[in-house]
Amino acid sequence: MFEADYARTELAVTTPGTDMVCQRGWYSSTDFWSPELFDMYVVPQLRKLTALAHKHRRKFAYVMTTGVEMLGPRLADAGVDVLYFVDPVLDKLSCRKAAELFGDRMTIVGGLNSNTLVEYNNQKIRDEVREAMDVLGPTNRFILHPVDSLFPDVPWESVACMIDAWKDYQ
């Protein structure tokens, strides 16, 4: 399996216009791996992938939604530049804790659970955007993003509210 990941990464980093390679680690979380097994089997392969990306002056991103508090520092140590998706609800990882752990080591994508948008409570959406921006914004390594995506049941008004709250923060 690693050979396929390496070949895919190599193709991506040698393709003109590629800025970043993203490895989806949906099955590389503490839901499936103990920290010891993660260190033994995932980290060494990940180091090779990040080294390949960096050799070609590309960024390397990794997707992980649970177990981030425990495994995230290992991702940073392995050379990951961007961590998708820091989820304050699903993973119970507050923006403050994420900033402490990774704020100076990796760009963090997330900070807002998409379920917040389903409820369409303007004040709650604005409060959560402000919290994420207050805490993670100063790191200059933060991309506000509803984790893990916008689903069909999310009212557009909620998305507009999130965007407006972000704009108001600027």
Residue ranges and their predicted role:
Residues 1-170:
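Active-site loop segments of alpha/beta catalytic cores
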